[in-house]
Amino acid sequence: NKIISAHCEVNDLLKGGYIHDGVYCKEHGHKGICSKSEWAQIERDCKLAEKTGCRYHVCHISTKESVDIIRKAKARGVKVTCETGPHYLTMCDEDLQEDGRFKMNPPLRSREDMNALIEGVKDGTIDVIATDHAPHSKEEKSKGLKGSAMGVVGLETAFGVLNTKLVKTGIISLEKLIDMMSVKPREIFDISGGKIEVGAPADLALLDIDKEWCVDPEKFVTMGRATPFQDWKLQGENLLTIYKGEIVYEAL
């Protein structure tokens, strides 16, 4: 009863693209990645999961079609779960700049896609919000949209971004955000812990949900510092991280 987890991408449809095949792509002479390269595999895989009865998890969805396909599959009883990332819920291709910190895979999609993802979070179609944390060196991310490596960091900004843009605006509750970032991943992937009780592993984070801070990559603890959220003013910061009973991060 193991789960199958997939990064969905049809290679034949990529055609050398590296950002979303939208208005920005065309106006600036870039090669685009079409939405179908993602949702076509999800559509196929959901049919296979329905036929076989297997558990299927879709990583970092980014398109409105993906949300719709998964929503309909769940309604049919398919054992499918999915996730998206903070950047797909708070940015779109209108926010792109000629900078490697805006390059990730899947790419930032259209505003319509972003809004569909938000609806998917609200109605429960999307189960998990994960960082898709992909650290790269400064050199690897210094070659613009075309030449930079795919992927951005997210560990140090995820809660602040989502708390600011989804919770403080009333789109979802704090409890739902915690569930999507912490509880649901544990349940889906059969990870022990995640409970505050005697004898349970002490894996905890202490968060100040109202603390205001500005995203400064130079202050990141991690080596990867390519973030599209640079200079964003956020509410909600991690003050303490305990892993297996040991304090591994402290900013009290």
Label each region the model flagged.
Residues E65, E112, M180, D190-I191, ...:
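Short, conserved clusters of charged catalytic residues that mark active-site
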Residues L14, V67, T90, S137-E139, ...:
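Glycine/Thr-rich phosphate-binding loops of Rossmann-like dinucleotide-binding domains
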Residues L14-K15, K31, S62, T90, ...:
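Generic, ordered loop/turn and secondary-structure boundary motif
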Residues G144-G147, P201-L252:
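C-terminal cap of metal-dependent C-N hydrolases
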Residues N1-I129:
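Histidine/acidic residue-rich metal-binding segments in metalloenzymes
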Residues G85, G100, M104, K141, ...:
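Glycine-rich, flexible loop/turn motifs
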